[in-house]
């Protein structure tokens, strides 16, 4: 079942990109899931995987603050999930094409990260799916996520009521 929820995936580490998103979502009473918690344990992975598989909107900013190998892999898994014919979820992706100065100091990791980012970005540009969005800034990501959430909220009762062929939405 798709949850009427925005999943705040993507760059973790010490990143604070989620803070303005959560503040805005709270002010608009938008449900969200934040996988970046202080006391994360392996047991948290079950809830995180559930949200990644079922939230109606998934955000994936891949920022310059980490090498992002895990986030890039999650983008791939999520794309596969959203390309299913019966999936009514939306995926919003932002991939920066650079790294912070600090991360550039490790030339091998930096080179691999930049290569992976470029490849994933180019593959995403080729995907023909109406529910995969590529944005250039966090502001665009926030604005689009709010609009998509409003659309999901409006259409949800009608899908449940009038379309018996869709899985529970």
PLM ranges: what are they?
Residues 1-169:
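Conserved catalytic or regulatory cores that recognize and/or transform ribose-phosphate-containing ligands
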